[in-house]
């Protein structure tokens, strides 16, 4: 039975043949379909076709993101994010310098690079979409460096204008949702500690201090400046929040408290417009329940008042005496005209508490009514209260009790 070649499909009449892909081949038919080179030791196949090593990786292997050519397994490559580049293709598009591993660079249009020095010194690339590749993965700071390209050569110490520019950039980012963010710069923990220590010493560092920090940390001066701006903005927000919290705390923790029942009250709040007096926090002797001491304002009460509305007390409590109802007369020239006192004055046989001249009023001690000493205030007909009472009232007169 004749054996046919898998390449030319002709019978194999040669003494030697090659077995590729479990099929017999002429020696001359085992060749690369691209370069027509005979393959004797090793070959690659795809879709039934044979390829040499170089052509196979060039056609089906990983493509270089710079030149769009295939990458051979023996070639040295550099990777930036998910892209792979030849060494010769991994160069700065401005100065054509080959970029080494770990060096910070900026990717433009996904396949072009700008080294750090050229990026910072150039102002013509701000319209491109920028991406940064860094070897550090600890902590990140993402300032908007797209708008800062033209500000770097003209960097000044005016931090106020820088803060305004940062606020404007934030507003622009909020307004345009499709706007891409700037490159992400990584800050290590040690660098962050250095920046925090410098901020604690000087919240608004000068250009000279920023240059020193750039030398110590290895960060860009613009990154340091933006970090300080963000830090100052954060401090201001924290102060505003703390001040607002303190005001709210004072408002909710210190409301207008209700006065205790035993506390002092102002006479206008306690008495209002009534003509009667009020006893305050008197620390001395006090009136026992049922005592018949009472005081009323100057002038006789009107006849329309009922006994409950007036200041007269009936002697029906435990402090009553054999004298019956004690009603002190009003002091003044119209005391005899009051019908309440006509009966008391017209009866000469009314018992008197102690001997004396008829018609003479004598003060009676408080022990008779309450079992204790009388309150320490003078029995005067014209002077107002003073001393232990809570408030003076010059218009209030006092009548003697008999």
UniProtKB/Swiss-Prot annotation:
Compositional bias (Low complexity):
124-135, 300-311, 322-336
Compartments it resides in: Nucleus
- Which spans does this entry mark as compositional bias, Basic and acidic residues? 151-167
The region called Disordered is annotated at 124-186, 298-402
Q: Name one GO molecular function term.
A: RNA polymerase II transcription regulatory region sequence-specific DNA binding
Q: Which Pfam families match?
A: Homeodomain (PF00046), LIM (PF00412)
Q: Which GO terms of the cellular component aspect does the record hold?
A: chromatin; nucleus
Cite a single GO BP annotation: forebrain neuron differentiation
Instruction: Please tell me in which tissues this protein is expressed.
Output: Expressed in fetal brain and in various regions of the adult central nervous system including the spinal cord, the thalamus, and the cerebellum.
Question: Would the keyword 4Fe-4S be found if you checked this record's keyword annotation?
Answer: no
Do the record's keywords include Zinc? yes
- Residue ranges the UniProt entry marks as DNA-binding: 180-239
SMART domains, alphabetized? HOX, LIM
Listed InterPro entries: HD, Homeobox_CS, Homeodomain-like_sf, Lhx1/5_LIM1, Lhx1/5_LIM2, LIM_Homeobox_TF, Znf_LIM
Keywords from the named record: DNA-binding, Homeobox, LIM domain, Metal-binding, Nucleus, Repeat, Transcription, Transcription regulation, Zinc
Main localization category: nucleus
Q: Which residues form the LIM zinc-binding domain?
A: 3-61, 62-125
Q: Which PANTHER family match?
A: LIM/HOMEOBOX PROTEIN LHX, LIM_HOMEOBOX PROTEIN LHX5
Q: What does this protein do?
A: Plays an essential role in the regulation of neuronal differentiation and migration during development of the central nervous system.
What is the protein's given name? LIM/homeobox protein Lhx5
Q: What is the lineage of its organism?
A: Eukaryota, Metazoa, Chordata, Craniata, Vertebrata
């Amino acid at each position: 039975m004749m054996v046919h070649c898998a390449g030319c499909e002709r019978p194999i009449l040669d003494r030697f043949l090659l077995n590729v892909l479990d099929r017999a081949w002429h020696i001359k038919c085992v060749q690369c379909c691209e370069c027509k080179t005979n393959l004797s030791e090793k070959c690659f196949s795809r879709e039934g076709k044979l390829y040499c090593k170089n052509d196979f990786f060039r056609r089906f292997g990983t493509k270089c993101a710079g030149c769009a050519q295939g990458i051979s397994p023996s070639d040295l490559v550099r990777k930036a994010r998910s892209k792979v580049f030849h060494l010769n293709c991994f160069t700065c598009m401005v100065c054509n310098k080959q970029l080494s591993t770990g060096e910070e660079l900026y990717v433009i249009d996904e396949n072009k690079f700008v080294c750090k020095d050229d990026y910072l010194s150039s102002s013509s690339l701000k319209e491109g979409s920028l991406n940064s590749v860094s070897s550090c993965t600890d902590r990140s700071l993402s300032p908007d460096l797209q708008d800062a390209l033209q500000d770097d050569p003209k960097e000044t110490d005016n931090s106020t204008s820088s803060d305004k520019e940062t606020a404007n950039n934030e507003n622009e980012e909020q307004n345009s949702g499709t706007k891409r963010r700037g490159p992400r710069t990584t800050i290590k923990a040690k660098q962050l500690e250095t920046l925090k220590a410098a901020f604690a010493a000087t919240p608004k560092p000068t250009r000279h201090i920023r240059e020193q920090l750039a030398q110590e940390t290895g960060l860009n001066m613009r990154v340091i400046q933006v970090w300080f701006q963000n830090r100052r903005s954060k401090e201001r927000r924290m102060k505003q929040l703390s001040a607002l919290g303190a005001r709210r705390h004072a408002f909710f923790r210190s409301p207008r408290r209700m006065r205790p029942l035993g506390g002092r009250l102002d006479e206008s709040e306690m008495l209002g417009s009534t003509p009667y007096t009020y006893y305050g926090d008197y620390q001395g002797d006090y009136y026992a329940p049922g005592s018949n001491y009472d005081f009323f304002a100057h002038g006789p009460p009107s006849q329309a008042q009922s006994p409950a509305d007036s200041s007269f007390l009936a002697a029906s409590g435990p402090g009553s005496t054999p004298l019956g109802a004690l009603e002190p007369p009003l002091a003044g020239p119209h005391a005899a005209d009051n019908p309440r006192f006509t009966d008391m004055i017209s009866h000469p046989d009314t018992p008197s508490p102690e001997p004396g001249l008829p018609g003479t009023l004598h003060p009676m001690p408080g022990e008779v009514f309450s079992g204790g000493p009388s309150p320490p205030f003078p029995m005067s007909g014209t002077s107002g209260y003073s001393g232990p009472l809570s408030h003076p009232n010059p218009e209030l007169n006092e009548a003697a009790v008999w």
